[in-house]
A protein has these predicted regions:
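A Zn2+-metalloprotease active-site environment signal
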Residues: 3-8, 18-214
Length: 214
């Protein structure tokens, strides 16, 4: 993404002292610079920029289908309380990502690439897993000492993932410093995606089919 404005609320949150929250997935307490309210605020502020950059795919039937599928998965997740938003972006890139607070995106490119609804559910479940496990907030907390400007870029890089999008954010946000999710976070998102598939009567082995795509 060439430009994604950073909400003022994120800067304020990053400048504040850490709070303690309970991770919804692990049940363990963790120190964080982003509580749930801050996650939701960040996602809400960033969402219009994502849609403005890519454009929403102009097919209401497809949008409704993906939203209904995503909502079913989210209702069986560890953070069913969030107001989840699922959007198909008008991009040929094979990509999917999520912002803190329950904003999940898949491109028309990845939808064309996948073979089945179960595979699409696996992709969406993986991204839901990043949100439910608070991976963006964890990355922000670990990077706190890097400075607010660099940290802001790392948060966006973490939630948007590697590849062209992250590279473009890096160029505009903080001198090329953008970090992706860690291997452990990706593995946890895979495991959560498989769990959410099983909870919705899909074969969890479909996660194996989509791991290479993600």
């Amino acid at each position: 993404m060439r430009f994604l404005s950073l909400p003022i609320v994120l800067v304020a949150v990053l400048a504040a002292s850490c709070a303690t929250v309970v991770n919804p997935v692990t049940g363990e307490s963790e120190r964080t610079v982003m509580d749930e309210a801050a996650e939701v605020a960040e996602g809400k502020k960033a969402h219009p920029g994502v849609v403005a950059e890519y454009g929403a795919y102009n097919n209401p039937r497809v949008q409704n289908y993906v939203n209904e599928l995503g909502q079913r998965l989210a209702r069986q997740s560890h953070r069913a309380n969030l107001q989840w938003t699922f959007t198909v972006l008008d991009s040929p890139e094979i990509n999917a990502f999520a912002l803190p607070g329950g904003y999940v995106y898949v491109t028309r490119g990845i939808m064309a690439y996948l073979d089945s609804e179960a595979d699409l559910a696996g992709v969406i479940g993986h991204e839901i897993g990043h949100v439910t496990a608070r991976h963006g907030a964890q990355r922000a907390t670990r990077a706190q000492t890097a400075g607010i400007g660099v940290l802001a870029a790392s948060v966006l890089g973490a939630v948007l993932g590697v590849g062209n999008v992250a590279g473009q954010v890096a160029q505009s946000a903080a001198a090329g410093y953008v970090a992706s999710y860690s291997r452990d976070q990706e593995l946890q998102a895979d495991q959560l995606g498989a769990e959410y598939l099983a909870r919705n009567r899909y074969n969890p082995s479909n996660m194996v089919d989509v791991i290479g795509v993600l």
